[in-house]
């Protein structure tokens, strides 16, 4: 009898130890995958939000005050009431190349070097040169970096009272948008599961906002930054970009179905050229009603390149803007590329702009 009690106590201790080992292993997996199911089960994370069907005009996440400033988010958008094309509204996109500042909360284990003051001034000079009303940013560090840039732009006479920065756990390079006009909807998602993947997610999420002008015009702006080409396994990186592009195409298809007729612009650093698979997936869409048109802006010399790739010693068109047919019919021209001398100091990418109507 005593012997059996001993073995029962031993087995209970052994089982408890095994349970603790498995629990710690599960927490470590979730720490690096971004999936917090186990944490929620333990009561250490907020309850999971139910996956909601997109409804035009309904934001599907709450925006912390330190990372977003919007107008009151609207529950519904009357697409039929959108005014006809009016005065042009300039949109500019720029990969600002590691715009990190001191004091920013670090989200990865990598060593980050703050961007120099001269380089940050150069970024502000480029944006001020184009005088946009809406700015899409790639590789901005976070809320502090965005505030730093907004202050430099304000010193140059450009005020952007509305903004959104999309932060992805484990990734220091964020997406952001600045706007002169109110952001009235937000469908941005930081944790987007990849197509045909159970746990793996897009590296930087999908930025997705709707901006309303004073005359009632609406523009839906979507931004993305696909997997870098700087990787040990180039084939794996290319495959990941394709998966991310397909996932983004699914997002765009949903927009096309739920808000048909709404002017849509998609900007991104695709880390692939126009003829490569990832940008073509985004442009062609998953159905005819979700197909986009690529703009072909040029600089003052008639050149289209947006990045000089030092490793391959080649000029690339990795930064691209797509628009849906509704918006393209309202526009005139292809836009341009800011090629002032400050461009070389600001980033390894050049800024693109286009005029929306």
Can you describe what each PLM-predicted range is?
Residues 2-152, 167-168:
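N-terminal, active-site-proximal structural segment of metallo-dependent hydrolase catalytic domains
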Residues 78-81, 108-114, 131-139, 163-165, ...:
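Second-shell loop/turn segments in exported
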Residues 214-222, 226-244:
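Metal-dependent phosphoester/phosphodiester hydrolase catalytic core
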